[in-house]
Amino acid sequence: MSTLGMTLLILLLLLPLATPDDVGQPPKRDTLRNLLKIGTRGQGGCVPPGGGRCKANQACTKGGNPGTCGFQYDLCLCLRN
């Protein structure tokens, strides 16, 4: 059997394993991008990159410590709990 034929056979055998049972459902794990939103500190709190403010369940942090960021344009992370 040729290499291409063998590769196709292996892919066909693995296809059922690659298909999740809950197709169309959102992933169960949050990605790192969803967990950490890097923003800058504006007037009155952490401002996410797209503008606006962190939600009530997010905390403005600097250097891994919860709290305010000190200066207006310090880098901060909006962490989802």
UniProtKB/Swiss-Prot annotation:
- Provide the tissue specificity: Expressed by the venom duct.
User: Using the chain's own numbering, where are the disulfide bonds?
Assistant: 46-69, 54-76, 60-78
Q: Name one GO molecular function term.
A: toxin activity
Residue ranges annotated as transmembrane are none
Question: Signal peptide: which range, if any?
Answer: 1-20
Q: Where in the cell is it found?
A: Secreted
**Keyword annotations from UniProtKB, A to Z:** Disulfide bond, Neurotoxin, Secreted, Signal, Toxin
Residues of the propeptide:
21-40
Q: Which residues form a coiled coil?
A: none
Q: Which domain of life is it from?
A: Eukaryota
- GO CC annotations on file: extracellular region
Keyword Signal recorded: yes
Free-text comment about domains: The cysteine framework is IX (C-C-C-C-C-C).
Name of protein = Conotoxin Cl9.6
User: Which source organism?
Assistant: Californiconus californicus
